[in-house]
């Protein structure tokens, strides 16, 4: 029997607010255990949560970016469960009135196939702390993450392959990243994904029994976990067995999913309205204010780059892969620089440098101003492309003005024939055999002479001018 795969994803996105959702403690990633905490995070008797308005702002932006309806009147709920990293023994979340509902996002697969994935809901909640199990036999609780604001985005079960799930995550990350409400870095835990997967015979409308898969720290691991889980369930069903509703953990070393626990239902959490957080009324004016603050989406930027700036689809996609690079590009072309040249540098030397140094664009000295200044120096013949690579390294490491560095370092390209001719004659004198070979019909000998000329000028000779002069002198020698 053949089965159809049914996949739904629950994605937790950590919001980039300076303070926590109900506490004034910092949300900064890292730091010593329990250093970014407050009495509210510790859940001391008598303390009350205070809502961070910026979290609701971010929730509205996310809902707008995902084409969602917004609950104009909403409240928070208590989700009750006991665990050491949850000192209150309940989590403040949203149950029946999430901030956003009935959304959608378009995905595109590698083969160009497009599909629309519906989004059931997006609700705001607080994160839990973190347990660490030491080798000394003790378990330790770090509450730095306790109370960090999250938005959980729950898709409908519209995905039918692991590839579609991967494409959905890619599109979702891009949509959220461009709102500016989160950096969506899976490696730092600011984007986490749980997958619900089930199988059903083709033609059957009812869903099969689902399993939830956790502990996937990359998009590729989500795909691997789904591939394994689909195969595991299919094997059980074909053998006449039954699938249990359970939670499983993905082991990235073995590529397998492992049973964690039998899955709880919503009733197990005994949701009820949170009495210490008031109901919030979201006005149309508030929504429109958030809409006006949203930057141009990645999709809109790609269309602008292709239709207005003449870039290729490939270039447009590379530039919009991260908002930081896209913002940098947009600033750079304001300096009246050829968009294609800026694009080439960002995709070439800049990307290579960032990869090798394991840094992000804002962490180096390169700016839209000094990059475009350097490109102009290439275009007007002041420096060669080869010298520009040296200039770029200097700018990346130390910042500053490209023009000032070129002058200070003596890297200005030599284009004056009166300066080049004596050097050319000196090269001929030192390489008489190569000159004789060229005059004897060996055209490649001239290339060796060009190389010697560039060496003699330490790469500062204008290649076009130098080569033209050298050939003229060879023919007249």
UniProtKB/Swiss-Prot annotation:
It comes from the Bacteria. Keywords: ATP-binding, Ligase, Nucleotide-binding, Protein biosynthesis. It catalyses: L-glutamyl-tRNA(Gln) + L-glutamine + ATP + H2O = L-glutaminyl-tRNA(Gln) + L-glutamate + ADP + phosphate + H(+); L-aspartyl-tRNA(Asn) + L-glutamine + ATP + H2O = L-asparaginyl-tRNA(Asn) + L-glutamate + ADP + phosphate + 2 H(+). GO terms for biological process: glutaminyl-tRNAGln biosynthesis via transamidation; translation. It is an enzyme of class 6 (ligase). The keyword Cell inner membrane does not apply. GO terms for molecular function: asparaginyl-tRNA synthase (glutamine-hydrolyzing) activity; ATP binding; glutaminyl-tRNA synthase (glutamine-hydrolyzing) activity. Its EC number is 6.3.5.-. Heterotrimer of A, B and C subunits. HAMAP family: GatB. Belongs to the GatB/GatE family. GatB subfamily. Allows the formation of correctly charged Asn-tRNA(Asn) or Gln-tRNA(Gln) through the transamidation of misacylated Asp-tRNA(Asn) or Glu-tRNA(Gln) in organisms which lack either or both of asparaginyl-tRNA or glutaminyl-tRNA synthetases. The reaction takes place in the presence of glutamine and ATP through an activated phospho-Asp-tRNA(Asn) or phospho-Glu-tRNA(Gln). This is Aspartyl/glutamyl-tRNA(Asn/Gln) amidotransferase subunit B. It comes from Lactococcus lactis subsp. cremoris (strain MG1363).
């Amino acid at each position: 029997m053949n089965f159809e795969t049914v996949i739904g994803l629950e994605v937790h996105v950590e919001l980039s607010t300076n303070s926590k959702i109900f506490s004034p403690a910092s949300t900064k990633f890292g730091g010593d255990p329990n250093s970014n905490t407050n009495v509210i995070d510790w859940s001391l008797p008598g303390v009350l949560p205070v809502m961070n308005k910026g979290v609701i702002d971010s929730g509205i932006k996310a809902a707008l970016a995902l084409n969602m309806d917004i609950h104009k009147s909403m409240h928070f709920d208590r989700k009750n469960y006991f665990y050491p990293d949850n000192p209150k023994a309940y989590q403040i979340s949203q149950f029946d009135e999430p901030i956003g509902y009935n959304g959608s996002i378009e995905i595109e697969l590698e083969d160009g196939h497009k599909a629309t994935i519906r989004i059931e809901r997006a609700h705001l909640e607080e994160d839990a702390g973190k347990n660490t199990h030491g080798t000394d036999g003790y378990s330790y609780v770090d509450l730095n993450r306790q109370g960090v604001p999250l938005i959980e985005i729950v898709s409908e079960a519209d995905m039918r392959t692991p590839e579609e799930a991967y494409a959905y995550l890619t599109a979702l990350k891009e949509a959220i990243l461009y709102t500016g409400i989160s950096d969506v870095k899976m490696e730092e835990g600011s984007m986490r994904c749980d997958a619900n997967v089930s199988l059903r015979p083709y033609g059957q409308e009812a869903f099969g029994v689902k399993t939830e898969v956790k502990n996937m720290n990359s998009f590729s691991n989500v795909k691997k976990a789904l591939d394994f889980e689909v195969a595991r369930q299919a094997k059980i069903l074909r053998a006449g067995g039954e699938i249990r509703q359970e939670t499983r953990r993905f082991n990235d070393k073995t590529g397998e999913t492992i049973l964690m626990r039998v899955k709880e239902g919503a009733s197990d959490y005994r949701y009820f309205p949170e009495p210490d957080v008031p109901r919030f009324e979201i006005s149309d004016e508030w929504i429109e204010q958030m809409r006006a603050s949203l930057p141009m989406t990645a999709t809109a930027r790609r269309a602008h780059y292709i239709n207005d700036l003449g870039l290729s689809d490939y270039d447009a996609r590379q530039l919009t892969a991260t908002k930081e690079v896209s913002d940098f590009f947009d600033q750079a072309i304001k300096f009246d620089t050829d968009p294609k040249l800026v694009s080439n540098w960002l995709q070439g030397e800049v990307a290579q440098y960032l990869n090798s140094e394991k840094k992000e664009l804002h962490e180096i000295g390169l700016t839209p101003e000094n990059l475009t200044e350097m490109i102009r120096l290439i275009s007007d013949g002041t420096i060669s492309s080869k010298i520009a690579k040296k200039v770029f390294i200097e700018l990346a490491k130390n910042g500053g003005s490209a023009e000032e560095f070129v002058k200070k370092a003596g890297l200005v390209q030599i284009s004056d024939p009166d300066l080049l001719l004596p050097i050319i004659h000196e090269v001929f004198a030192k390489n008489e055999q190569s000159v004789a070979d060229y005059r004897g019909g060996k055209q490649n000998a001239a290339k060796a002479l060009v190389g010697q000329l560039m060496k003699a000028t330490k790469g500062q000779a204008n290649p076009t001018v130098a080569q033209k002069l050298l050939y003229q002198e060879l023919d007249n020698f």
